Amino acid sequence: NLSVNLQDLESIGWLKLKEIPEGSLYTTFDIVENPKNLQLVEMDMFSRFSAMEGDVDLAMSFFSNTSQEKYNFNLLKLFDENIAYPQVVAVREEDKDAQWVKDFMDAFTSQEQVDRINEKNTPTLSWKILFEVKEDSASLEKSEEKSRKADPNKTTIKLGVTPSFEYYIDYIPEMMGEWGYTVEVVSLDSPVAANTALAEGSIDVNYFQHLPYLLAFNESNGTRLHPCEPYIMSSMDCIASKKYKTLEEVPDGASIAVADDASNLSINLEDLQSIGWLKLKE
């Protein structure tokens, strides 16, 4: 996530990053220019928006309507799909071919799910991408939906989400319930807790992370969590503030909360460079 934040900052020209090998992640050591003298404060994703109450001037994190309503911030910048990574549903490797996983993904990418989300979400590029993914997928026929039966080997599914992602899955229990499943939503307080719970088996599936974060977690922890396809681009990084309403108002020396993990920090740095606020090493 730290890498994500750095790429975000590069994309708006607030930083310049050095060039690194493809597939590598940016760190703060890769900054070569910091023309706005930004003070980067590394925080977990659940602390960044709340920190704007006093500790920091700006925050970078995933944008959602629920977060904006909860923290009442100004949206200064929403980064486009060239920076964002695909969000993934994750299961344990041994479950990836199970019928219940296929059923879950059909529900998650169904037209009904997309329509429910778009009814209550301000239209953004992120949900247009989700809609396009579904347009290119094989839609569920109504007759198939009604006749579908739950996987006899597993009818109760524990779905783990972090707080900011509960918004995106509230229709799934209803839809899968029509097929004979019981979906229990388990709220977990951090990304690490959500992946640890999945690896240990206290939940069956989770949704909250992008692909680089999942791969980095597997590598660091020796876990075998599997990203299910299709990948869904359901959230975009943003720069938010309670003090300022536009990027132009942000003074030199401002403090900005960025990700405290490598994958998202790298993107944050690149985004800051894209808006001219940093320059990263080659």
Give the positions of each predicted feature.
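Beta->alpha turn/N-cap motifs
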Residues: 44-45, 54-66, 164, 189-191, ...
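Ligand-binding "clamshell"
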Residues: 53-55, 67-79, 216-228, 243-244
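Extracellular/periplasmic juxtamembrane helices and adjacent flexible linkers that interface
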Residues: 105-153
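A bilobed periplasmic-binding-protein/Venus flytrap-type ligand-binding module shared by bacterial periplasmic
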Residues: 84-103, 235-248
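A conserved helix-loop-strand patch within extracytoplasmic ligand-binding domains
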Residues: 1-16, 111-114, 228-281
